[in-house]
Design a protein with these regions (language model features):
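N-terminal Rossmann-like FAD-binding beta1-loop-alpha1 element of flavoenzymes
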Residues: 35-62
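Mid-domain catalytic core of redox enzymes
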Residues: 17-18, 31, 56, 266-411, ...
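Conserved flavin/dinucleotide-binding core of flavoenzymes
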Residues: 3-4, 17-20, 24-31, 131-135, ...
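Glycine-rich FAD pyrophosphate-binding loop
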Residues: 54-77
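Conserved Rossmann-like nucleotide-cofactor binding loop
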Residues: 45, 68, 335
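A short alpha-helix-loop-beta-strand transition element characteristic
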Residues: 75, 98-120, 178-182, 357, ...
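Dinucleotide-binding Rossmann-like beta1-alpha1 core, especially the glycine-rich loop
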Residues: 79-159
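Active-site/ligand-binding neighborhood in enzyme catalytic cores
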Residues: 153-273, 280-281, 287-313, 324
Length: 509
């Protein structure tokens, strides 16, 4: 810790997480913070990372730009409606998710009702349920007769040789055009809000890519994996859809409590990181927290600089933030890294920060009474060729309890994506009118049935797109981390975009 707190004569004898205080002739107190590890970014990845480190007894702090934690996760409660402005569900696709809730409060984990197993696809003029067995697969109108027969030969097709083959290319090659059009394309819109002909399979859908590369076939690989004995830990990855009791923000609150809220510094803007000494780091920023912030960092995060002398400098310094650490983990978006890591070679930063993000408009629509109508499914996805103005509609109140009043319904509607980015700039009136029209047409809601809730959330840079440029991005990340072994670049710029992916990555940092 000597190199981290060198400004204090006896810093080697001080406990971690110490505020060092100095005074000038005017008696103005300044402070600086020292931790073993600093996590930059208070979204899900950053919070789980800090929580897991605290479980190991590591002295860790979280630095967040906004005056709230959670990143895109934000739960709202209005009347009897509970809705999200960001991700609302995920799948138990990794054991780390179940293990995390074991460490927190198991009762927080809310598994979806059985209705969530049903998924709808818009086909011609109606929603059609996706097949979930042999018979439904043979009879579904979503796949042409030609492609149904063609699928029989899938186990015998050769492996792809292009490592940058896109999701669209591999699915058409192995499955056929109708599978691509009615399954893969809407799935990619629902997960990435992206274009399957731009997303590289080995980055965007690594498990699918591994099936072909390891077993030579999707079908053969899936069968082989089902036959492979699973460990007790493997069985924790049940693939079930999950959320949290009371909304996703409950998870954020529990993580904050587990970390220790005094270790979370909010409202730190203009953050700049720089190497300090042989094996240390210094993070400087400006504290812009408000009084009603979730954590009071006005007391916890002010600057420490022995060389400030006059009153003007001291007054400015009161708003500064300094934190020193032995290790730094960044979990912030790729576009925030050039300012934060200005000491890194510009060519490497460019390869990391040019990551493309899909813009998404998310609209919560609630009805207190849907006049007996039932929507027994997880939701409906829309192929890009269908000519609709929405990418998909989720049914949170069908999947989870207490999302809407009894007899009512809550819908989460998604628009925009890489194909229609213009929606993020559209007016509230245009979005509302379009969404209600689509709900009426696609779900059969009466035109005289007025919603009791409409809330619009715009996310100009919502979802990272794992396109061909990911090769350069991952190489640049590896080069930076090799040059600076105590610096880790994490977050959804690599290792997957879903909440379960974020939890898995964080548990391994």
């Amino acid at each position: 810790m000597d190199s981290l707190c060198a400004m204090a004569p006896s810093s080697q004898n001080m406990a971690p997480d110490t505020q060092l205080r100095v005074e000038n002739s005017q008696g103005l107190a300044l402070s600086s913070h020292c931790h073993e590890v600093v996590v930059v970014g208070g979204g899900l990845t950053g919070l789980v990372t800090a929580f897991m480190l605290r479980q190991k007894g590591v002295d860790v702090a979280v630095v967040e730009r906004e005056n709230r934690i959670g990143g895109q996760i934000h739960t709202y409660h209005e009347g009897d409606f509970t809705f999200e402005s960001g991700p609302s569900t995920s799948a138990l696709s990794h054991p780390e998710v179940a293990e995390l809730f074991e460490l927190l409060d198991k009762s927080t984990l809310l598994k979806a009702r059985k209705e969530a197993h049903a998924r709808w696809i818009w086909y011609k003029r109606n929603f059609v349920e996706m097949p979930h067995g042999l018979w439904s697969g043979l009879t579904t109108p979503l796949v042409t007769l030609y492609d149904k027969f063609r699928l029989l030969a899938e186990p015998f097709r050769q492996r792809g040789v292009n490592p940058d083959e896109t999701v669209g290319e591999i699915s058409r090659r192995r499955l056929g055009n109708s599978y691509f059009r009615n399954f893969v394309d809407p799935f990619v819109s629902g997960v990435y809000a992206g274009d399957p002909d731009k997303l590289v399979t080995r980055f965007a859908l690594p498990k699918l890519y591994a099936l072909e590369q390891t077993y030579g076939s999707f079908i053969r690989g899936a069968i082989q994996k089902m036959r492979t004995p699973k460990t007790e830990r493997d069985r924790l990855a049940t693939k079930e859809v999950w959320s949290c009791e009371g909304g996703m923000e409950r998870l954020i609150e529990q993580l904050a409590d587990g970390i220790g809220r005094e270790r979370i510094y909010l409202g730190v803007t203009s953050a700049v990181l720089r190497p300090e000494g042989k094996d240390g780091w210094e993070l400087r920023g400006v504290v812009t927290t408000t009084e009603d912030a979730m954590l009071d960092v006005s007391e916890l995060s002010t600057a420490c600089d022995e060389h400030l002398s006059d009153e003007k400098e001291m007054q400015t310094a009161k708003n500064n933030f300094v934190c020193r650490a032995q290790r730094v983990i960044t979990t912030c978006p790729a576009y925030a890294l050039p300012q934060l890591l200005s000491f890194v070679e510009s060519s490497l930063l460019k390869d990391v920060s040019t990551l493309t993000y899909a813009p998404v408009v998310q609209v919560a629509v609630g009805f207190k009474d849907v006049q007996g109508r039932s929507f027994q499914a997880f939701g409906g996805l829309v192929p890009s060729t269908a000519g609709r103005k929405v990418m998909g509609i989720l049914f949170p109140s069908s999947c989870f309890s207490h999302r809407a009043p009894e007899g009512g319904a809550l819908f989460s509607v998604f628009m925009g994506g890489v194909r229609h980015p213009e929606w993020v700039e559209a007016s509230d009136e245009a979005i509302t009118e379009t969404v209600l029209s689509e709900l009426q047409t696609m779900l059969g809601l009466p035109r005289d049935l007025q919603p009791d809730l409409v809330r619009i959330f715009r996310h100009p840079r919502a979802i990272p797109q794992y396109e061909a440029s990911s090769v350069e991005r991952f190489a640049a990340i590896a080069a930076i981390q090799s040059q600076y072994p105590t610096l880790t670049l994490a977050g959804n710029l690599r290792d997957g975009i879903g909440m379960s992916d974020r939890i898995k990555q964080a548990c391994g940092l």
